[in-house]
A protein has these predicted regions:
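Basic/aromatic DNA-contact patch characteristic of tyrosine site-specific recombinases
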Residues: 1-52, 56
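Flexible interdomain linker/hinge and immediately adjacent N-terminus
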Residues: 9, 75-84, 99-131, 175-177
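Non-catalytic DNA-binding core/recognition domains of DNA-processing enzymes
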Residues: 36-105
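Basic, Lys/Arg- and aromatic-enriched nucleic-acid-binding interface segment
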Residues: 120-149, 252-258
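Short, charged phosphate-coordinating catalytic segments
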Residues: 142-167
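Short functional hotspots where side chains directly engage DNA or cofactors
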Residues: 168-174, 238-253, 257-288
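C-terminal catalytic core of Y-nucleophile DNA break-rejoin enzymes
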Residues: 175-221
């Protein structure tokens, strides 16, 4: 890279070369190259912001003009954030961003503090200035489809499909994180009718409430899908049981039902729904 380019420009170009938008991360994992790429715009923006903050600091504090020079101060930068009391989640995000920037592993850096599920605060408190009663149709739609915010924004009537084998409607070709496509069940006839009443080619929802706690509605959807598939724990072979750890110790789930719910949400690992969806729903007063 030319020496006369600013260190910010060097960050931008380095991360831009790693963009794999629209490519399947699953296949990259099979090839062993997944760690080399960035598969979503949101991840790219996060990594870019954290990396730029680092090189600005390295330039101001140590006079660094190239990424190679700044590399010597990565551990100092991470330790600075640990000492300042930044959360383990912020520490890990910084480390992950810089590992992507330098094409290495976070294990090559100063260890960050351990992240604990109990410290996650998203969707555990009511979001101010949002009335679920006044937005009931939208909230019910979210709970019936389990879509992410950007997936709702991009939803068209063409995504609705009738499955003759089951006699039920599905959402098909939903483009999730990293460009992954999935199909997901619709849990209410009202949601189906709302889609059917939308003109072809038009967004199903032209306006999406900015303060809606969509993650919590996805947790409700996950719980419903799980309960529709779950077997009584006592009847499940031990190999099909998922035993939670840490502060969730003692909670047992049906792996098969978890896999169905996980696919419907657009996640590959069932551990994600155990910690961020099923238990999130219990904490808000639900009962599996």
């Amino acid at each position: 890279m030319p020496k006369n380019k600013s260190i910010i420009y060097q960050v931008q170009e380095t991360l831009k070369q790693k963009l794999c938008i629209g490519e399947q991360k699953h296949f990259a994992k099979q090839l062993g190259t997944a760690s080399d790429g960035i598969y979503s715009w949101s991840t790219y923006k996060t990594y870019l912001a954290k990396s730029c903050a680092f090189v600005k600091w390295a330039r101001a504090q140590h006079g660094c003009r190239t990424l190679a020079e700044a590399r010597n101060y990565v551990n100092t930068y991470i330790k600075h954030h640990i000492d300042k009391g930044y959360s383990p989640y912020t520490q890990k995000t910084i480390a992950s961003s810089l590992a992507k920037l330098y094409g290495c592993s976070t294990k090559d850096f100063t260890p960050t503090q351990t992240r604990h599920r109990a410290n996650i605060t998203r969707s555990r408190k009511g979001i101010a200035k949002f009335s679920e009663s006044r937005n009931k149709e939208f909230v019910d739609f979210c709970r019936a489809t389990g879509l992410r915010r950007h997936e709702i924004k991009n939803l068209k009537p063409e995504n609705l499909s009738y499955d003759e084998s089951t006699g039920k409607y599905m959402l098909v070709n939903i483009k999730g994180k990293g460009g992954r496509l999935r199909d997901c069940p619709i849990l209410s006839k009202e949601a189906v009718e709302h889609i059917q009443n939308t003109p072809a080619g038009k967004p199903v929802w032209s306006k999406i409430p900015s303060r809606a706690d969509i993650h919590s509605y996805r947790a409700d959807y996950c719980k419903t899908i799980y309960n529709l598939q779950a077997r009584p724990i006592a009847e499940i072979p031990k190999r099909d049981r998922y035993y939670c750890r840490g502060d969730l110790k003692g909670i047992v789930y049906d792996k098969r039902a978890m896999a169905v719910a996980s696919r419907a949400l657009g996640h590959n690992r069932i551990s994600i729904i155990a910690s961020n969806y099923l238990y999130n729903w219990i904490e808000r007063g639900g009962d599996l």
